[in-house]
Amino acid sequence: MAKEKFERKKPHCNIGTIGHVDHGKTSLTAAITKVLAEAGGATFTAYDQIDKAPEEKARGITISTSHVEYETPNRHYAHVDCPGHADYVKNMITGAAQMDGAILVVSAADGPMPQTREHILLARQVGVPAIVVFLNKCDMVDDPELLELVELEVRELLSKYNFPGDKIPIIKGSALAALENSDEKLGRDAVLELMKNVDEYIPQPERPVDQPFLMPVEDVFSISGRGTVVTGRVERGIVKVGEEIEIVGIRPTQKTTVTGVEMFRKLLDQGQAGDNIGALLRGTKREDVERGQVLCKPGSVKPHTKFKAEAYILTKEEGGRHTPFFTNYRPQFYFRTTDVTGVVHLPEGTEMVMPGDNIAMEVHLIVPIAMEEKLRFAIREGGRTVGAGVVASIIE
């Protein structure tokens, strides 16, 4: 029997559950698979299967994450759930499991708690585009006024971190009721209502191939009689033979024209997101281009040296530093394909950063790098990863 071809007829979207410990993230994840399985859009995955999340390595950091997939009538979803708070922090900062949107789970019995706040802040810092809220454990709250208060608190918290708190859908329900079939309205119906809102409210992500062209430079060769070939994996967009592109980062931006695209020694008329290609550049000398620069659509990305970042610093056990660092710390920042030295400025009131901390900090690089918000990087000391980060905003 031939293996069934995976046909993706529906648009794909990556989401995840976030929120305070024990507010019901994993139960909700299980409940979604159970309810959608009845409609044939998922395989039911029980709580304990999701809870024993396998460990993965992302940028040298060990993270436990569980992945489930399911579909609604409109979309195919990959859903990520993490067992521990530290795993969420690492996951969101490294972008190990990318999120196009998040389901914030808040227990109606407790209201927003410290990690609720921290996950919303992280979602803002790492650029999660949209959040839908599931007010869980509503079967434990008899007073409708109390529910309204919790809802108001959640909306205020979201607004505080620049999410549209007054517009975000909040669905009241109970993941346990859905799993135990005890209360149709708070259980199954609430989960279906949640997924309807996730479908409608979380915007469909733009596919990498539809975004402006960008390719990090991995290697540069000179081919006699042909010119200079730059190799790398196209990160996004499409590049066609004959198109004008820019070389951005490290040195002043240069314009050039792509006169050929090669893949596996064959000449193509274009290269697109995901392809490993060699691009032949007109009139560009071998010494004009270096690893760490990017080829991109003119005007789409600018070089920057100063930015604000959210970073996670590895523990000693993860192979990180054994000691704290202070402001003016000078490690290397590994962006895409190269290390650049930078100086760290800690926020006022933060004396030092301990291994295992996550921190908002300002970085000044010694040379400019092609960057934009949401770009991930590693923090390294002599080739050893000591942290991971994401560009939260650009200063200059």
From Swiss-Prot:
Residue span of region G3: 81-84
One GO cellular component from the entry? cytosol
Which positions does UniProt annotate for GTP binding?
19-26, 81-85, 136-139
Location(s) in or outside the cell: Cytoplasm
User: Where are the annotated segments for G1?
Assistant: 19-26
Record function comment: GTP hydrolase that promotes the GTP-dependent binding of aminoacyl-tRNA to the A-site of ribosomes during protein biosynthesis.
UniProt protein name:
Elongation factor Tu
Q: Which organism is it from?
A: Afipia carboxidovorans (strain ATCC 49405 / DSM 1227 / KCTC 32145 / OM5) (Oligotropha carboxidovorans)
